[in-house]
Amino acid sequence: MITLKGLRKEFAGTTALDGIDLHVESGLIHGIVGRSGAGKSTLIRCLTGLETPTSGTVVINGEDVTAYTGARLRKARRSIGMVFQHAELLDSKTALENIAHPLVIAGVKKKQAMQRARELITLVGLEGREDNHPAQLSGGQRQRVGIARALATEPKILLCDEPTSALDSTTTAQILALIKQLRDDLGITVLIITHEMSVVREICDSVTLLAEGRNQHTASLREVLSDPASTLARELIPLPSAPIRDAEDATVMLEISIAGLSAAEVFDAAQRAGTPIVEVEAATLERIAGLDVGRMRIRSTDAQATRALGRTLTERGIHVEEAA
């Protein structure tokens, strides 16, 4: 369990985190998203004790670790496993030795550390690669070693900082599936820092949007998607830009956000309203978190009927905007 209360961090008069409140229940996969400069990196450093907050508290598994130093801080850090964008493995060591390394540093006997590393090699699907050095491994395999290394101390929390942004789409899907499986098998809490909304759509149970050091929105993925007109939902379900239209084009364009119903129901409503849809200019429709969600942009020549359709859809709880 992770709880942040009023977390604030300033650097030479610049506010990186501005009073963040956040609670993540145990066993969830929670995404932290935001553009560059939103405060994601500073948040990570405060969570891991690499930065001391200017004010506020960080509670990890019931312990306020904000003021911890020395041995108490090192012990608290062992409850958090870190997975980075690049695994940063030691080139001189084998995959097995890289996984065992944090245990050896922590004072665990080498025989015990290597036994734990062998268990983790199997857990992350790298049997047969134990004696390979990093240069002999693919990017996805190196990331699996990094994940295994993060789990060496049996942490309760796995903190993943852009874990797939350096990988191709196929390998990304495999690594995300592995993280989800590890959560299911080990019961750990996973915090994923990412700018890739596809990662959130794929495996997150809940998500937080950071902007200018503030928590702009936190909710379960299903709650976010049930409000498809929200800022976060628009990020998760983007539409392509509208094509440039002729100044004399008299068609009316509606942007429709869908949650919990199909595109066919929208077209059925249009037909009953007598609205001649000229063109579907763009559409994004998919099933996420067990919910059919999407957005579409339609164009029609009948302004009056189109606006009547918009009102009908709005009455049914569907968000509709007239696009410029």
Provide a role label for each language-model segment:
Residues 65-81, 105-110, 224-228:
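ABC ATPase NBD coupling module
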Residues 48:
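Helix-to-loop junction immediately C-terminal to a conserved catalytic motif
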Residues 218-219, 227:
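ABC ATPase "signature
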Residues 132-135, 152-153:
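Conserved signature/switch motifs of ABC ATPase nucleotide-binding domains
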Residues 33-35:
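The feature captures the beta-strand-to-loop junction immediately N-terminal to the Walker
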Residues 63-64, 100, 104, 111-128:
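Conserved ABC ATPase "signature" region
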